[in-house]
Amino acid sequence: NERIKEVVERLSSGGVVAIPTETVYGLAAEVTNLQAIQEIFFLKRRPSDNPLIVHVSSLKQLSEISKPLTELELSIINKFWPGPLTLILPRKKKVLDAVTAGLETVAVRMPLHSLCLDLLQRTGPLVAPSANLSGTPSPTKKEHVQNDFGPSFPILDGGACSIGLESTVISCRTSHLSTTRKNVPANSKTPSQSDIIIYRPGAISEKQLSEFGTVEYYSASQAEQDSAGSIPILPSPGLKYRHYAPKARVEWLSSIDRLWAATETSIVLLLDKTQL
């Protein structure tokens, strides 16, 4: 595939390319290229304390960036990879701080998209946060990427994303203690005793994960409390900053009459379905 060869060359020379996955399109760069990673943060207007997700095509690639897996982590990976599930794992020292926002953990997943996997097999691990301006809805086809970054932006077109929703992000119990930033003492908060923590809901549900043990959510209130503290422990994207906010007026409607009066560009939220 000539197009993939072009993308591989661009990435290997330090470029940034939008790539398809089954969830959303991502802005990809080599995981070892600091300048390219910084370019992603600049393009997205993404805060540097918001960690990136690394994409891999195999367990061998995973072993390049993550410490050995626990039995629980391996069982979950065998069940859901490739697929829309990101695991937060203890990182190897060679992983750049720019990727992890200075955390001792790294977020990793294996996408369920043949074109993306083909690319990853040729390039090795890639960082690939959603290919949009931070805070806006994520792109599920190339036109969405072009809306944010222009018609000439390099894109590997893989068609419309089959899922169209970001991956579920989790950590397993033995890794909960590893989410503090480097050179900062652990805070006094008692670590979770659940087997699995869901940091960001997505295509893989709590019910599916409960097959592997007890599951809890990292709540919005806990995220707010942690980010306001002197030791923010926010190991996952989607915990600290606004996400998926459309550029449209929102109208709260209480009757069917007001629905017909709403403009075509509004997002309509009905407070009382019985009035329909």
Cite the ranges covered by each PLM segment.
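Active-site-adjacent structural elements in enzyme catalytic cores
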Residues: 1-276
